[in-house]
């Protein structure tokens, strides 16, 4: 019988697209630290020897963008010329415009307030920064309620970075990728890890044998629980044979090109909007966080084994145009009642999300590598499960 396999990938903080994400979010954090009401849409391109920062920003803060860019690159580990990219001497170009006044007006004065339909509710005043659809997801495959393939992929990449930064493996360089294939049983429960792929940038002098031995013994076997590994698990370590040239010298990087790595590894649907470089009035980011918060609390409350949440917005309108809950038949109550409970327990207007999750803070750079969801190494407000009792109470009182 054909195996039921599912694969997800992660990339390291030194991957060129992730370098761009971290620069964009470092700039966002610097703005929010000085002016919590900053409106930021910051994009970054990185390529050999050069960084280009552009976008639309409206803020009362002054931020030395070039300094933020260089410090971010150096912190990642691109700190010497032989890596092909060096934060000390790369060119940094900046082209920032103000946010469109048309968009700003729609965000600051929602349709509800313009049509006097807000009942003087201050949380009605902010409209969504754009139209769009966003998804959130949670599943009981891991303690952090994430799909197992993406969870393991992120953990592998964090482990590789740790071994590089603490100098256990002096020959590691910043760029790396991991991919994990998990076999599932007929009920959709994980059985074992079928294949692990790790491609990691290294110095030229290290042998393929040493790389393989280190990745298997110090990374894979330290990260993946033994119950998921057996004699049939396949390990593919630097399968291209050589990975010395990497980072922005090997490939150009651009903000927002790793949206599946950032979320659920393809296990759940994605609305298409990227996160990094966007302030929380952009629902691409804040509503995706809220959707994860909703889904995680539903699963944590024992109301479903898995849950996918879709939210949708119209530009300049405060209230979501739609809310959808899909538990794929695993819910203990029907999805319509769960949707009703969500409407009553969670405030999913942009200003409501910002208040509920306290999003006008400089907390975003830490999300720009190794995933925005299921993080156990940093404290993120949308990962809290503090709404479980409110959901259970609503269900109990309305069944």
Swiss-Prot record:
Matching CDD domains: S-AdoMet_synt
EC number: 2.5.1.6
Lineage: superkingdom: Bacteria
Reaction catalyzed: L-methionine + ATP + H2O = S-adenosyl-L-methionine + phosphate + diphosphate
Cofactor requirements of the protein: Mg(2+); K(+)
Binding sites annotated in the UniProt record for Mg(2+): 17
Enzyme class name: transferase
The protein's role, per its UniProt record: Catalyzes the formation of S-adenosylmethionine (AdoMet) from methionine and ATP. The overall synthetic reaction is composed of two sequential steps, AdoMet formation and the subsequent tripolyphosphate hydrolysis which occurs prior to release of AdoMet from the enzyme.
Name the UniProt record assigns to this protein: S-adenosylmethionine synthase
Native organism taxonomy: Bacteria, Bacillati, Bacillota, Bacilli, Lactobacillales
């Amino acid at each position: 019988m054909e195996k039921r396999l599912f694969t997800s990938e992660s990339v390291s903080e030194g991957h060129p697209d992730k370098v761009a994400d971290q620069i964009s979010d470092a700039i966002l954090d610097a703005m929010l630290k000085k002016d919590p009401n900053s409106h930021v849409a910051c994009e970054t391109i990185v390529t050999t020897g050069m960084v280009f920062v552009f976008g639309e920003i409206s803020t009362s803060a002054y931020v030395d963008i070039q300094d933020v860019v260089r410090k971010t690159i150096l912190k990642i580990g691109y700190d010497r010329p032989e890596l092909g990219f060096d934060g000390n001497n790369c060119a940094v170009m900046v082209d920032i415009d103000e946010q469109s006044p048309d968009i700003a007006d729609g965000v600051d004065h929602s349709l509800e307030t313009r049509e006097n339909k807000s009942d003087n509710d201050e949380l009605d005043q902010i409209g969504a920064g754009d139209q769009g659809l966003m998804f959130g997801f949670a599943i009981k495959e891991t303690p952090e309620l994430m799909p197992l393939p993406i969870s393991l992929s992120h953990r592998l990449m964090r482990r590789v970075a740790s071994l590089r930064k603490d100098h256990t493996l002096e020959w590691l360089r910043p760029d790396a990728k991991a991919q994990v294939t998990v076999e599932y049983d007929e009920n959709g429960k994980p059985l074992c890890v079928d294949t692990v792929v790790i491609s990691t940038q290294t110095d030229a002098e290290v042998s393929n044998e040493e790389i393989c031995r280190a990745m298997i013994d110090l990374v894979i076997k330290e990260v993946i629980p033994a119950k998921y590994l057996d004699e049939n698990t396949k390990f593919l370590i630097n399968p291209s044979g050589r990975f010395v040239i990497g980072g922005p010298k090997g490939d150009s990087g651009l903000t927002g090109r790793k949206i599946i790595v950032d979320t659920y590894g393809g296990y759940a649907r994605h609305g298409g909007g990227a996160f990094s470089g966007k302030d929380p009035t952009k629902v691409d980011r804040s509503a995706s966080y809220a959707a994860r918060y909703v889904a995680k609390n539903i699963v944590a409350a024992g109301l479903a084994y898995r849950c996918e949440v879709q939210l949708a917005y119209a530009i300049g309108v405060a209230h979501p145009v739609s809310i959808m809950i899909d538990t794929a038949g695993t819910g203990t109550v029907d999805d319509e009642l769960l949707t009703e409970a969500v409407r009553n327990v969670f405030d999913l207007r942009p200003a409501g999300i910002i208040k509920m999750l306290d999003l006008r803070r400089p907390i975003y750079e830490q999300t720009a590598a190794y995933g925005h969801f299921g993080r156990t190494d940093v404290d993120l407000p949308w990962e809290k499960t503090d709404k479980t009792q409110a959901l259970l109470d609503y269900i109990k009182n309305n069944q």
